[in-house]
Every structure is written in structure tokens, then in C-alpha cells.
Design a protein with these regions (language model features):
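Class I S-adenosyl-L-methionine-dependent methyltransferase catalytic core
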Residues: 2-286
Length: 286
């Protein structure tokens, strides 16, 4: 029987590192279902395609362009089988199975073994991202030791149009005509967390965030921004009049969490009407 890869389990995503974004599904579902049929969507920093997959699942014939910047996802896809091998060896070395002991530290002896095993990964950076969550000071306590469904991973991007563009502010006007632009840029602290040039360099991170700032200014359609609550981008979104959503289950947490800013604008179907063109020339918000 052929599997339906759109009906994935929201609690058990088939790909690593999408769990945090999928926690937004209760907020996103009514927003996605309200999008007009055939709307054009640009997912600017798609990561592991979590938001694009939710759009594909609940949208009505949406035309989704997902930007796999630097082939981030496809690098990880190529290493899923090798990551599963590493997981098997780490479990045999005494690592916890699953996320039940997510915040429990390992003994120094087991920790040393796990680090050595992880270092055998074919692409060590990709393997680290697949296995860890958190930054360098907490990463060793947070192995995600659940083998991945290789078949589901291979079909994860079916039906999506994939791009590979490193975005900067000068490119924002090129994507401004989309009905919806999804912005999920790297956090400001990301380069320091992962090390210069390993996951994403500081210059690329700054360029990505500059693209988001410009996109919020020039976009004709709606914009969804995911970022840290105290960031400059969230402050800009609030000034524009964005609706700010707290992710379910994160309110009052001590650690930094993520918010979603929803900038609601007219559908692009009306963007070229003379009245709206005149309003934009006058600098009026529409």
C-alpha cells in the first residue's frame, strides 16, 4: 500500500530537528486554511521544510517555493543512513533511547564515548546537527537518539519547488510579489553557538536577517516571521502592526523562546490596481 507522506505524525516528524517548528501547528493551521486557493508562497529559509510541509498539508493548491539555502536539508538527507549508524552505536555505548531523559547529563565516561562515536560520522557537521539540539555548552546532554525513517526522509520534499539561494537585502524586491513570505532566519546567536563557518557564518547570518528586514518593508502580501522575542526584527514587525503569537507551551519559560509575527496584507491579486500602486508611491501602508 502506498504511503501518504503528507499525513505525517505531528508528534513524530520523520526528519530530525523539525520538532520545534512543528509545535506551531495549532497556531498555523487556521492561518494556512484561510489562505486563498492557489496562493504563491516563498519559504525563504526553509531549514528542514517544516513550515512548507504544513502549508502543503493544509493549504489549497498552494504554489510553494522552498529555499534550501546552501543545500542545508539535502546535505542532511544524504547523511541520514550514516546518522542512523551513529545512533545505533551510541545506544550500544549506553546513551539514552529517545528524549525521555532530555535534560539529564551523562557521566564523563559515557559522554566521552558518545563524542568519539559521533566524530566517526561521514559528515561531522551534518551528523552533529542531526543528533544535537542546543549550543556548544549544552549539546552533549541533548542527543536525539531515535533512528530516522529513511523512506519518509527521501519523500519529505515531494511536491515542493526547491530553490538554493543565499539571500540578502538586495533580493527582497524580487520576492515581494508572493502572496505569503515565510521568514525563519538564523538567530543572532547562531554563528557563536555553532562556530564560525561550521553551520552558518556571521556574514551570511547578517545578510539573511537584513533580507528579512527589507522583505517586511517591501512585501505586497502577508509575511510570517519566526524569531527571538527581543530581536530587532520582531521590534520592526511590531512597529508595522504585526500580530505577535507566542508558541503554545513556551509562555513564562526561563530560556529564550520563539515568537511568530504575522503581518497581514492584501492578496497580490489586487496589488497592481492603480489605487494601491498610488498608495505605495506615497509611502502609505497597505
Amino acid at each position: 500500500m502506498e504511503r501518504d507522506y503528507l499525513q505525517f505524525d505531528l508528534q513524530k516528524p520523520p526528519l530530525p530537528f523539525v520538532g520545534n517548528k512543528l509545535r506551531w501547528w495549532r497556531t498555523l493551521r487556521p492561518m494556512i486554511e484561510a489562505l486563498p486557493r492557489g496562493a504563491r508562497v516563498f519559504d525563504a529559509f526553509t531549514g528542514c521544510f517544516a513550515v512548507s510541509k504544513l502549508l502543503q498539508r493544509w493549504g489549497r493548491d498552494l504554489r510553494i517555493v522552498a529555499n534550501d539555502c546552501g543545500r542545508y536539508y539535502r546535505r542532511r538527507l544524504a547523511d541520514v543512513a550514516d546518522t542512523n549508524r551513529v545512533i545505533t552505536e551510541m545506544l550500544a555505548a549506553g546513551a539514552h533511547n529517545g528524549l525521555r531523559h532530555h535534560y539529564e547529563r551523562y557521566s564523563p565516561e559515557i559522554e566521552k564515548k558518545l563524542i568519539q562515536i559521533c566524530a566517526t560520522g561521514r559528515d561531522q557537521i551534518s551528523c552533529r546537527i542531526n543528533l544535537y539540539c542546543g549550543n556548544g555548552s549544552t549539546v552533549r546532554a541533548r542527543f536525539r537518539l531515535v533512528p530516522y525513517d529513511e523512506d519518509a526522509c527521501a519523500h519529505w520534499i515531494d511536491g515542493l519547488e526547491c530553490a538554493d539561494v543565499c539571500l540578502d537585502a538586495s533580493m527582497a524586491t524580487h520576492y515581494a510579489r508572493f502572496d505569503l513570505v515565510v521568514l525563519d532566519p538564523p538567530y543572532r546567536r547562531t554563528p557563536a553557538s555553532w562556530g564560525q563557518g561550521e553551520y552558518i557564518g556571521r556574514a551570511q547570518c547578517m545578510a539573511a536577517r537584513a533580507f528579512c528586514a527589507e522583505m517586511m518593508r517591501v512585501a505586497r502580501g502577508s509575511v510570517w516571521l519566526f524569531d527571538e522575542p527581543d530581536s530587532d526584527l520582531v521590534a520592526q514587525a511590531r512597529e508595522i502592526g504585526a500580530v505577535v503569537h507566542d508558541r503554545p507551551g513556551t509562555r513564562n519559560r526561563q530560556e529564550a523562546h520563539e515568537v511568530m509575527c504575522e503581518i497581514r496584507r492584501i492578496p497580490n491579486a489586487y496589488a497592481d490596481f492603480p489605487l494601491f500602486a498610488w498608495a505605495r508611491q506615497k509611502g502609505l501602508a497597505i
